[in-house]
Amino acid sequence: MATERTFSIIKPDATARNLTGAVNAIIEKAGLRIIAQKRIRMTREQAETFYAVHKARPFFGELVDFMTSGPVVVQVLEGDNAISKYREVMGATDPSKAADGTIRKVHALSIGENSVHGSDAAETAAVEIAQFFAGNEIVG
């Protein structure tokens, strides 16, 4: 198995409900290591850059507003097949369709307030990690 790194965000709906520890417990139970983590208030510029792929979509403004509405926890996760494993642990974007025991099934409020983000590919993970972490902040 390939050891990989992936990027995670615990979103404002989850941090507002003090769920960081609960989400981290699910992540670690799945065998992923949290090798970098910080709680930040995402700026509008950071959110617009991060979600630039959705700029033409009708929900872009609401997404940026949501992601800047409160603190988020940005993380680097590491483990065997970390990208696919974390996507499995997160569950489907729509919490009503997420598998039992996944982060979104347990904690998400709606499709929009779905508690977490995870990278979808190695290339995306590298870009997302670099947007929020300097190399010396990642301690594997």
Curated annotation (Swiss-Prot):
Q: Where is the active site?
A: 117
What compartments host this protein?
A: Cytoplasm
Biological process (GO) annotations held by this record are: CTP biosynthetic process; GTP biosynthetic process; UTP biosynthetic process
Q: What is its EC number?
A: 2.7.4.6
Read off the InterPro entries from this record.
NDK-like_dom (IPR034907), NDK-like_dom_sf (IPR036850), Nucleoside_diP_kinase (IPR001564)
By its UniProt entry, which SUPFAM superfamilies does this protein fall under? Nucleoside diphosphate kinase, NDK
Domain of life per record: Bacteria
Residues annotated as binding ATP are 11, 59, 87, 93, 104, 114
Gene Ontology molecular-function annotations: ATP binding; metal ion binding; nucleoside diphosphate kinase activity
This enzyme catalyses: a 2'-deoxyribonucleoside 5'-diphosphate + ATP = a 2'-deoxyribonucleoside 5'-triphosphate + ADP; a ribonucleoside 5'-diphosphate + ATP = a ribonucleoside 5'-triphosphate + ADP
Quaternary structure, per UniProt, is:
Homotetramer.
NCBIfam families per the UniProt record, alphabetical: PRK00668.1 (NF001908)
Q: What is this protein called?
A: Nucleoside diphosphate kinase
Q: What is the lineage of its organism?
A: Bacteria, Pseudomonadati, Pseudomonadota, Alphaproteobacteria, Hyphomicrobiales
Q: Which gene encodes it?
A: ndk
